[in-house]
Amino acid sequence: MNIVVATHNEGKLVEIRDILAEEFGDGAHDIELVSAGSLGLPDPVETGITFEANALLKARFVARLTGLPAIADDSGLIVDVMGNAPGILSARWAGEHGNDAANIDLLLAQIEDIPDDDRTARFRCAAALVVPIAAEEDVADFEADPSDGMDDGDGLVDARETVVLGEMPGTIVRHPHGSNGFGYDPIFMPDEQPAGAEESGELLTSAEMTPEQKNAISHRGKALRALMPAIRELVETGE
């Protein structure tokens, strides 16, 4: 069973493989994951206004181009006192896409005067699985158009779609701590802490956790685990 993951980040494949191993055991070896990046596929333009819409857009885009089942996710940070911003703009909150330091600096400045008890936030992830039920014969020859992955599903006669959510609630701290992870991890302290952290009084930001500790509680991990029943159905039925 081949499944394309709509990402250019090979690290996501590792995380999904780990979760597949949890779910399927030795059967995970029957599932071959390949990234959109390794196939030379472009990223679609993310025109959705929700995480769910963008995850589905990306999965549809890849499924359309390959004729294969596709997994995609979209995630970001929601700060309650900011009216759920930065939300889908999380990666480019300061203007430049992926400038983590600038995004953190701007966010901290915007809530500088907010009391600690009111700095609640959560990471949210939407994960989507799109399974083509029937595809055009020449699907591999379609020209990649990053702008229309959401609009019409050209190349898919029909498809089964599943979208799920995962969240990691927490608090925005006042200064960055830790060097692991990426994005807003250095200023986000999850409510759920590793064993022993609360007892010791040394609460950790996401960036102070090991990858294993973070993946066990992360929004993406929760969303991907919620997607596993749909993937199991795909593996067992082949459709």
Curated annotation (Swiss-Prot):
Cofactor binding note of this UniProt entry: Binds 1 Mg(2+) ion per subunit.
Any one biological process term the GO annotation gives: purine nucleoside triphosphate catabolic process
EC top class named in words: hydrolase
Residues annotated as binding Mg(2+): 74
Superkingdom of the source species: Bacteria
Residues annotated as the enzyme's active site: 74 (proton acceptor)
Family matches, as Gene3D superfamilies: 3.90.950.10
Coiled coil: none
Keyword line: Hydrolase, Magnesium, Metal-binding, Nucleotide metabolism, Nucleotide-binding
EC number: 3.6.1.66
Catalytic activity annotation: XTP + H2O = XMP + diphosphate + H(+); dITP + H2O = dIMP + diphosphate + H(+); ITP + H2O = IMP + diphosphate + H(+)
CDD domains the record matches: HAM1
GO-annotated cellular components: cytosol
Cofactor: Mg(2+)
Free-text function comment from the UniProt entry: Pyrophosphatase that catalyzes the hydrolysis of nucleoside triphosphates to their monophosphate derivatives, with a high preference for the non-canonical purine nucleotides XTP (xanthosine triphosphate), dITP (deoxyinosine triphosphate) and ITP. Seems to function as a house-cleaning enzyme that removes non-canonical purine nucleotides from the nucleotide pool, thus preventing their incorporation into DNA/RNA and avoiding chromosomal lesions.
Subunit structure: Homodimer.
Family according to the record: Belongs to the HAM1 NTPase family.
Name of the protein this chain belongs to: dITP/XTP pyrophosphatase
Species of origin: Bifidobacterium animalis subsp. lactis (strain AD011)
Taxonomy of the source species: Bacteria, Bacillati, Actinomycetota, Actinomycetes, Bifidobacteriales
